[in-house]
Regions:
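Conserved small/polar residues in nucleotide/adenosyl-binding loops
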Residues: 1-10, 196-203
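Functionally important transmembrane alpha-helices
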Residues: 122-195
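Transmembrane alpha-helix/helix-exit interface in multi-pass inner-membrane proteins
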Residues: 55-98
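Juxtamembrane helix-boundary/capping and inter-helix hinge elements in multi-pass membrane proteins
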Residues: 40-48, 141-145
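A loop-to-helix transmembrane entry motif
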Residues: 112-126
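Membrane-helix boundary elements
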Residues: 93-116
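Transmembrane alpha-helical insertion/packing segments
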Residues: 4-5, 9-28
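Generic transmembrane alpha-helix signature in multi-pass membrane proteins
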Residues: 22, 33-40, 53-54, 65-69, ...
Length: 205
C-alpha cells in the first residue's frame, strides 16, 4: 500500500503507475480466480460453473463500480435540482464547499454520451471476466503442467494488457477508441477460448 501511494503521488512517472495498476489487477484477480477454481471449486469445476464464475465476478464488479457510482450521481443530481445541495453546501466550511462544487461540476460539464460509455465499459469487463474465467478453467483442467502454466500465464498477460490499455490509453487516444479497443480484446478472448473448448470437446468425442 505504501508503494502504491508513492506511485500514485509521483505524477512525474505516470507510466510506472499505469504498469503498477494493470499488473496489480492482473495478479490479484487471476490469482484469486486460480485459487478458487483449483481448491474451493475443485469438486464442482466444469465449463458451466466456470462460465457462471465469470458472470458472477464481472456482475458483482459492475454493481460495485458502475451501479453504486450511478446511484451516487443520481442522488447528487436530485439534490441539486431540488435545492437540497445548496443547503448542504451552506453548512460546510468555505474550502470544503468549494471542493465539493468542484467535484460535482463533472455532472454538468461531462458530455452526456460519456455516462453511457461507462455502461459499455462494464459490459466489456463482464465479457472479459467470463473469457478469463474460462481460460483459468482450462489451465486448471489441463493434463500437462506445461500447458497449464502457459494457459495461466496467458490469462495473466491478457488481463494486464487490457487493463494497461484502459488506464494508459486516455493519455493518448479518445475515450471512444479506448472503449472499442477494450471491447474487441474482451470479446476476442471469450470467442477464442470458447471456440478452443468446443473444438477440444468435439475431438474427445
Amino acid at each position: 500500500l505504501v508503494g502504491s501511494e508513492m506511485c500514485i503521488r509521483d505524477r512525474s512517472r505516470p507510466w510506472l503507475y499505469y504498469v503498477y495498476a494493470a499488473l496489480a489487477a492482473a495478479v490479484f484477480e487471476e490469482t484469486g480466480r486460480l485459487i478458487a477454481m483449483k481448491f474451493w471449486m475443485k469438486k464442482w469445476l466444469d465449463f458451466p460453473n466456470a462460465l457462471m464464475y465469470g458472470i458472477g465476478h464481472g456482475g458483482v464488479e459492475a454493481i460495485l463500480i458502475g451501479g453504486l457510482s450511478g446511484i451516487s450521481n443520481l442522488v447528487s443530481m436530485l439534490m441539486i435540482n431540488s435545492g437540497a445541495m445548496q443547503n448542504t453546501l451552506a453548512a460546510l466550511p468555505a474550502e470544503s464547499a468549494n471542493q465539493t462544487v468542484s467535484q460535482l461540476s463533472a455532472l454538468w460539464t461531462t458530455p452526456a454520451p460519456l455516462f453511457f460509455v461507462s455502461g459499455i465499459e462494464r459490459i466489456s469487463a463482464i465479457i472479459l471476466h467470463i473469457g478469463l474465467s474460462l481460460l483459468i478453467y482450462r489451465a486448471v483442467k489441463a493434463g500437462k503442467c506445461r500447458t497449464a502454466a502457459f494457459t495461466a500465464v496467458l490469462a495473466y498477460g491478457i488481463h494486464f494488457i487490457v487493463d494497461f490499455f484502459a488506464v494508459a490509453g486516455p493519455a493518448l487516444l479518445p475515450i471512444y477508441v479506448i472503449e472499442i479497443g477494450v471491447f474487441v480484446m474482451a470479446a476476442g478472448t471469450l470467442v477464442t477460448v470458447s471456440y478452443t473448448h468446443l473444438r477440444a470437446h468435439e475431438t474427445r468425442h
